[in-house]
Amino acid sequence: MELVPVVLDLIGIFVFALSGSLLGVRIQFDIVGVLVIGAVTGLGGGIMRDVLIGAVPPASFTDWRYFAVPVVAGLVAFRFHPDLAKIEPYINWFDGLGLGLFCVLGSQKALIFGLDPVPAVLMGVLTGIGGGVLRDLLADRKPIVLRADFYAIPAFAGSLVVVLTWEAGKFHEWVLIPAAALCILLRFLALHYRWSAPRATDIW
């Protein structure tokens, strides 16, 4: 694997796993629960993507770093949660960072495995939101992507940049960085300005 995608992937896993682990601490999970919800949050989207595109066994099962990173994130959250309490209100911001990194990596991998543009964009979105959906289900709360949050749309935008540059023959791994930045920026703006996706009751 190329250096940039690997580094971004591991950063994304850590950030997502940290957000999931902090949630686990908040809702009184024990050490096992914190590690599990952290690992599921960090790895869930990528595993679902790999299974769907035929990249089996998933990367998470063939590279020890993919399991080591969420374990470290979980232990950090469990041990230092009193010190991390001041950043807990910003857990959605950490989630936004993971969303941006994962959506672009997901769409890139889908393209490498020969998917057409539209499915590749959808795989990027799935990679970005999948871990968060599983996290919310484990925490017994409605998934954030279903709560009218402006969440899947930023992932769609970041994935679309990757796919368009790929189709135009202009793709380079460094494209992943501005594409992820676009998704992260949109998500951060949504959090700051409280943007939400339209609901039926908003229109009719």
Where would I find each of the regions flagged by the language model?
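Intrinsically disordered, low-complexity non-transmembrane regions of multi-pass membrane transporters
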Residues: 1, 195-204
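The first (N-terminal) embedded transmembrane alpha-helix
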Residues: 6-19, 37-40, 158
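Short, structured motif recognition centered on aromatic/hydrophobic residues
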Residues: 36-40, 47-53, 122, 126, ...
